[in-house]
Amino acid sequence: MDQQKVNLLNYNYSQLRELLMAWDEKPFRAQQLFQWIHQVGIRDFAQMTNLGKVLRNKLSQLACIDLPEIVACQKSADGTHKWLLKLECGNCIETVFIPEANRGTLCVSSQVGCALNCSFCSTAKQGFNRNLSTAEIIGQVWLAARELSDNNGAHDKKITNVVMMGMGEPLLNFDNVVSAMSIMMDDLAYGLSKRRVTLSTSGVLPEMERLREVSPVALAVSLHAPTDELRNELVPINKKYPLSQLISLCKRYFKDEPRRKVTFEYVMLKGVNDQPEHASQLIKLLHNVPAKVNLIPFNPFPLTQYQRSSRETIDAFRDKLIKHGINTITRKTRGDDIDAACGQLAGEVKDKTTRSQRWQKLHFMSKTDKSTELTISSEEIA
């Protein structure tokens, strides 16, 4: 990116309006420009024909619309797409699109790597490098929308839902994530409702409180254990924000919207958190919580110590929760043949802690060996 130019993808609508006014332009120009960028998907200011030649020239001199670079794309047998995106700094992140009969869900990353070190998560093994900018977050949506439209026809596959469940802990990149989500929900951009944008967190309580006030999107909590002792091992941030505090906040999170529920994600690990006593503990923990539970079959990755629970064990766990009145489903595993399933996103992170060099090499080789559709550069796609 030209260091003298501002990347307009970093601006939500209100910020873009202020920017144009600072450049002595009429406020209504922000709406036109915003729609060109996000609804039409145009990056070339010369093609924005209703802006006027003087403004187009000014934008060319002062601004740019810079995106991550698509360096690889994989497509699963089930239709799931995974893109490897290279950032300006040289790191890579991953973005996944999951098509279903009546919806298309895009899984978006918020950080390069992750600092929380959850023991069952592939991204955690990469270490942490930095937060993504608003442009790098919303750029994933922009690129996916264009790729799906270009390759499948304008109406074949469409993004109807976004989940902030990719690489990183979204609430540790609060301002940029909230700004990007505001663009996703803006009718002048992608027009998603607040119920169709979901943020997943491991439980960063102060930022959960802030999120509740400023951006009431759907909330998913990475729970994964029914006791502090076990969750301390699986999700180490629990040592700072224990279950009693987390559940207390979840009980009141949607107090003004009693029909909304918090989704609790629970990865099923063989012999670790999947036994009948764990189900009983979870039932007790979620008593009087407006909750629904997603049971997630564990997705293995290189060097992991964990195994996936059997289908029979998962079904028995689910049935016990349902019997006690907890809305529970088992998440269908999608894209695991291309390492796009939950917990498998890894990208390529220049880890400042250098903890992951050996793991990265093994992970890359396993992905290369398994993939039958590891593709091509963005230029070849275009």
Swiss-Prot record:
Keywords: 4Fe-4S, Cytoplasm, Disulfide bond, Iron, Iron-sulfur, Metal-binding, Methyltransferase, rRNA processing, S-adenosyl-L-methionine, Transferase, tRNA processing. Its EC number is 2.1.1.192. Binds 1 [4Fe-4S] cluster. The cluster is coordinated with 3 cysteines and an exchangeable S-adenosyl-L-methionine. It catalyses: adenosine(2503) in 23S rRNA + 2 reduced [2Fe-2S]-[ferredoxin] + 2 S-adenosyl-L-methionine = 2-methyladenosine(2503) in 23S rRNA + 5'-deoxyadenosine + L-methionine + 2 oxidized [2Fe-2S]-[ferredoxin] + S-adenosyl-L-homocysteine; adenosine(37) in tRNA + 2 reduced [2Fe-2S]-[ferredoxin] + 2 S-adenosyl-L-methionine = 2-methyladenosine(37) in tRNA + 5'-deoxyadenosine + L-methionine + 2 oxidized [2Fe-2S]-[ferredoxin] + S-adenosyl-L-homocysteine. It is an enzyme of class 2 (transferase). PROSITE patterns: RADICAL_SAM. Its cofactor is [4Fe-4S] cluster. The lineage of its organism: Bacteria, Pseudomonadati, Pseudomonadota, Gammaproteobacteria, Legionellales. Transmembrane segments: none annotated. The active site is at 94 (proton acceptor), 342 (s-methylcysteine intermediate). This is Dual-specificity RNA methyltransferase RlmN. It comes from Legionella pneumophila (strain Corby).
